[in-house]
């Protein structure tokens, strides 16, 4: 890590693979490097493990919307936030699979299914398992986000062939209780451990723009990087202020700060896919381009992201053409060694 923070006469130091644990102080030094140096180093690390011009394409479907009992301050789906969102029942399996087929036709290689639950009930597990098995039969990667999981539920999803489980930590441990009180930071880490122990890959990241400090953002990434095995996928979301939610009037995130966070995620977790997730509709094409330069190599495609707007596929296709980017093929979605 010391090599990464070394700078001599403005010239960047050599870039070792960052495979060891990271401290908050080391991460702060890296984050605060001159912007050009930070992006240069992040791009070097990125090219060491991935095709720098390939972007992994995922599609996210809400299979059960609204009515969640949690009190997450940012969320349109919390029953405690008067956002006007109507709750729905769990979607039928065949409808989910029909949407998955459309996603594959649109270029997605990973299909993510999200349910607004505190945790899945046993009565719903059979349908959830059938969804995983059905999507796997389409030769797509599968991901689910269903709330907290027990070890037994994790094992059942693993047996069905689930590739990834998403469970974000959202923010730093210090700031966490300012955003959510109905489950603890440790609860989230426990679910991540259950998923990992079952052999499912982990997808875990957070949200920027909830009133946290820059140090909170850095701390969140250090927590993820220092898990026994870092997440294979790290979604970085920009808050979408939802009318009726507690964060409806939150101040926007500075785009340069957002790009710095992407770069730090890439350097601290060099083998992870760093996903430019919610909030892309609020980003300029130039900001997104800087994020890709900083090491982001995954996006959600489609016009909606759970209940939020997302750039349309035509816009993403045009942006990729302008930047010379290409969809990542399924067989190349694993990180390679330093080349």
Curated annotation (Swiss-Prot):
Domain Radical SAM core span(s) in chain numbering: 53-271
Any one GO biological process: biotin biosynthetic process
Assembly notes: Homodimer.
Gene that encodes it: bioB
HAMAP family: BioB (MF_01694)
Keyword Iron-sulfur applies: yes
UniProt similarity note: Belongs to the radical SAM superfamily. Biotin synthase family.
Stretch forming the signal peptide: none
Annotated source species: Agrobacterium fabrum (strain C58 / ATCC 33970)
Protein name (database record): Biotin synthase
Reaction catalyzed: (4R,5S)-dethiobiotin + (sulfur carrier)-SH + 2 reduced [2Fe-2S]-[ferredoxin] + 2 S-adenosyl-L-methionine = (sulfur carrier)-H + biotin + 2 5'-deoxyadenosine + 2 L-methionine + 2 oxidized [2Fe-2S]-[ferredoxin]
Cofactor binding comment, as recorded: Binds 1 [4Fe-4S] cluster. The cluster is coordinated with 3 cysteines and an exchangeable S-adenosyl-L-methionine.
Lineage, highest ranks first: Bacteria, Pseudomonadati, Pseudomonadota, Alphaproteobacteria, Hyphomicrobiales
Enzyme Commission number, as recorded: 2.8.1.6
Binding of [2Fe-2S] cluster, residues: 112, 143, 203, 275
């Amino acid at each position: 890590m010391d090599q990464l923070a070394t700078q001599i006469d403005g010239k960047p130091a050599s870039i070792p693979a960052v495979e060891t644990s990271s401290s908050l102080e080391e991460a702060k030094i890296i984050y605060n490097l001159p912007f050009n140096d930070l992006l240069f180093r992040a791009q070097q690390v990125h090219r060491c493990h991935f095709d720098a011009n390939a972007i992994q394409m995922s599609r996210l479907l809400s299979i059960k919307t609204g009515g969640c009992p949690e009190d997450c301050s940012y969320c349109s789906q919390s029953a405690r936030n008067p956002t006007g969102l109507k709750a729905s029942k769990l979607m039928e399996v065949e409808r989910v699979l029909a949407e998955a087929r459309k996603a594959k036709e649109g270029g997605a290689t990973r299909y993510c299914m999200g349910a607004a639950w505190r945790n899945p009930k046993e009565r719903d597990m059979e349908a959830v398992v059938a969804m995983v098995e059905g999507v796997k039969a389409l030769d797509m990667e599968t991901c689910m986000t269903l709330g907290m999981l027990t070890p037994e539920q994790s094992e059942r999803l693993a047996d069905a062939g689930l590739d990834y489980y998403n469970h974000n930590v959202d923010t730093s441990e210090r700031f966490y209780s300012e955003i959510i009180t109905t489950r603890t930071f440790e609860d989230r880490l426990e679910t991540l451990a259950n998923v990992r122990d079952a052999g499912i890959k982990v997808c875990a990241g957070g949200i920027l723009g909830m009133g946290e400090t820059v140090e909170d953002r850095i701390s969140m990434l250090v927590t993820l990087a220092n898990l026994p095995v870092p997440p294979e996928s790290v979604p970085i979301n920009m808050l979408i202020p939802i009318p009726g939610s507690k964060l409806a009037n939150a101040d926007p995130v500075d785009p340069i700060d957002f790009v710095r966070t992407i770069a730090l995620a890439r350097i601290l977790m060099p083998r992870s896919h760093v996903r430019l997730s919610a909030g892309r509709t609020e980003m300029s094409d130039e900001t997104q381009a800087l994020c890709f330069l900083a090491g982001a190599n995954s996006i959600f495609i489609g016009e909606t992201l759970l209940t939020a707007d997302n750039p349309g596929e035509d816009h993403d296709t045009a942006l990729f053409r302008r930047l010379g980017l290409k969809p990542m093929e399924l067989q190349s979605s694993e990180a390679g060694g330093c080349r």
